[in-house]
Structures are given as structure tokens and as C-alpha cells.
From Swiss-Prot:
Name of this protein: Thioredoxin-like protein CDSP32, chloroplastic
Subcellular location: Plastid, Chloroplast stroma
Gene responsible for this protein: CDSP32
Example GO BP: cell redox homeostasis
Transit peptide: 1-56
Species of origin: Arabidopsis thaliana (Mouse-ear cress)
Function: Probable thiol-disulfide oxidoreductase involved in resistance to oxidative stress. May participate in the reduction of alkyl hydroperoxides derived from oxidative stress by acting as a physiological electron donor to the BAS1 peroxiredoxin. May regenerate methionine sulfoxide reductase B1 (MSRB1) activity through sulfenic acid reduction.
Coarse class of the protein's main subcellular location: plastid
Statement: the UniProt record of this protein carries the keyword Nucleotidyltransferase: no
């Protein structure tokens, strides 16, 4: 248990992505006393509709200091540390995405329209914009939040910073928002072993395959593959149940990872009739789809 606690206490940088042959990239961590565990009893689940986010560049950009861009009314402009703290508090448990930018940054101007479009389509996410060169107050806020390069994106939940990125492309921003803010998709969110057992028990009949996406909060490959998981959860809802769990969410989740002998993430567990039939480790879209089809009973040739 000490090993698990030590892992949970480590910063983001300790989860090291690395390439793996034939399975794209994963993040690794090590447990003691690995043992396979058949667990489980059955399968299936309810579904909800997920509306895919379609991003297109608009005319909006951060613009000159003090000049808010058009058509971005859903992005809150922050002018001081006090306003920033109030916005985080008012968001409660919603995901907050804060962009720290400057008026002279070409990269900030390039990516801002995509954040504006996300703000229009992701109603359960709060978007903030801080122009670091607007005033002494915004400069002080950037120093407080340790912003060194722009554009810098920080992600918060319940006033706690859970993730941050800098210099990212629009597709990665969209992936991060989906990964950290996804609350209403057809992918069932699991928060511990009891949730896993409940999911399997609730879906005792129906013959569906359960695909359990096991990852970590701070895992680039996990974020990368998640939009694919969302799309598959819609297109395969008649035959496959999708669920996910972040191993570092709490001790129950981490113990589940240990019992399932998960040592790299993302790992996808394929469960049918209460037993783990197989697994796929990696973030390759084609390989994941192929494995899901194979465990669904579709003949796949490589």
C-alpha cells in the first residue's frame, strides 16, 4: 500500500509516456505482487446520447488588450486574481478551462477561436480567458499561477488544478476538454471496484461486450485515445458497453488496477459473462477498434 500511496503523491511529470511496439504509446507504472484476477460475473449497460464536438475556426481572437473579440460571450474575461478565484468557486464541480494568453502571441490568437467554439458546444464546462499583458493585476495572476509560456491552459475542478498544457494544438485542446469534462456521454464513469461490480451485475443479460478503459488523470495517451472511445460508444451502443476508470482517482481505483494486473495505461479490459476475455494496451485507434470487433465475435484479419 505504501507503493500505491507514493505513486499517488508524485507530480504529473512522473507518469512517463513511452512508445510501445504495435500498441502505440502508453504510460507505465509498477506494482508489487501482480496476480491475474478473474473477478466479475456478467455484463451490459444503459446508454446516453453524446453529441460530438465539431470544431471550426471562427473570427474570434483574444484581440488587442482591453478589446473583447466578437461572438465569444461564453468565455469569461478575467481581469484579476480575485475575479479568477470567484469564477473557480462559482463553477463548483464543473470543469474550468482557463487560457492564459497575451495580445502579441500569434499562437494565442490561433487557438482562441477553437476555445470559443468549444465554449458554445460544451455547456457543462466553464471557459476563462486571462490576458497576461492587460494590467498589473493580470500579470500578478500569471505569476501566481506560474505561467511561463502562452498560450497556457489550466484545468480545474472544485477549485483544484487537475491538469495543464502549454503550446498545444486545437485537437489536443478538444481531447483534454472531452477527457476531463466528460460527464454525460454514453461512457459510464466508474469510481471504484463497487461501481465495476454494479455495472456488470446491472447488465447481467443481453450478451453485450463490456469495454473498460483504464487510465490515469495525467496521461497523454489516455487523453489522445478518449475521443475515439466516445465515438465508438455511440456507434457501437447496440452491442458494446463502454466504461472508464482513472486509477489515480482514489485508493479503491488503484487497488482495482493492482488486482487486474494493469501496469500500463491506457489498458482496455474486454469483459463478457463476468470474465475478462482479453485486453489491449495502447492508444492506437485502428488496433483498439480491431480488438473490440474481435472480442465482439467479428472475424478480424490483420
Amino acid at each position: 500500500m505504501a507503493t500505491v500511496a507514493n505513486f499517488l503523491a508524485k507530480p504529473i511529470s512522473t507518469v512517463v509516456p513511452r512508445p510501445s511496439s504495435a500498441v502505440a504509446s502508453t504510460s507505465s507504472f509498477v506494482f508489487f505482487n501482480h496476480k491475474t484476477n478473474p473477478l466479475f460475473r456478467r455484463k451490459n449497460l444503459p446508454k446516453r446520447l453524446f453529441s460530438a464536438v465539431k470544431i471550426k475556426a471562427g473570427a474570434a481572437s483574444p484581440g488587442k488588450v482591453g478589446t473583447p473579440p466578437a461572438n465569444d460571450e461564453k468565455v469569461q474575461k478575467i481581469h484579476s486574481g480575485e475575479e479568477f478565484d470567484v469564477a473557480l468557486k462559482n463553477a463548483k464541480s464543473k470543469l474550468v478551462v482557463a487560457e492564459f494568453a497575451t495580445s502579441k502571441s500569434d499562437q494565442s490568437n490561433k487557438i482562441y477561436p477553437f476555445m470559443v467554439e468549444l465554449s458554445r458546444t460544451c455547456n457543462d464546462v466553464v471557459f476563462l480567458l486571462v490576458m497576461g499583458d492587460e494590467s498589473d493585476k493580470t500579470r500578478e495572476l500569471c505569476r501566481r499561477e506560474k505561467i511561463e509560456k502562452v498560450p497556457h491552459f489550466s484545468f480545474y475542478k472544485s477549485m483544484e488544478k487537475i491538469h495543464e498544457e502549454e503550446g498545444i494544438e486545437p485537437d489536443q485542446l478538444m481531447g483534454d476538454v472531452l477527457y476531463y469534462g466528460d460527464n454525460h456521454s454514453a461512457v459510464v464513469q466508474l469510481h471504484g471496484r463497487p461501481d465495476v461490480e454494479k455495472l456488470i451485475d446491472e447488465n447481467r443479460t443481453g450478451g453485450k461486450l463490456i469495454v473498460l478503459d483504464v487510465g490515469l488523470k495525467h496521461c497523454g495517451p489516455c487523453v489522445k485515445v478518449y475521443p475515439t472511445v466516445l465515438k465508438l460508444s455511440r456507434s457501437m451502443s447496440e452491442t458494446v458497453v463502454f466504461a472508464r476508470m482513472n486509477g489515480d482517482e482514489n485508493d479503491s481505483c488503484m487497488e482495482f488496477l493492482k488486482d487486474m494486473n494493469v501496469i500500463e495505461v491506457p489498458t482496455f479490459l474486454f469483459i463478457r459473462d463476468g470474465e475478462i476475455r482479453g485486453r489491449y494496451v495502447g492508444s492506437g485507434k485502428g488496433e483498439l477498434i480491431g480488438e473490440i470487433l474481435r472480442y465482439s465475435g467479428v472475424r478480424v484479419t490483420y
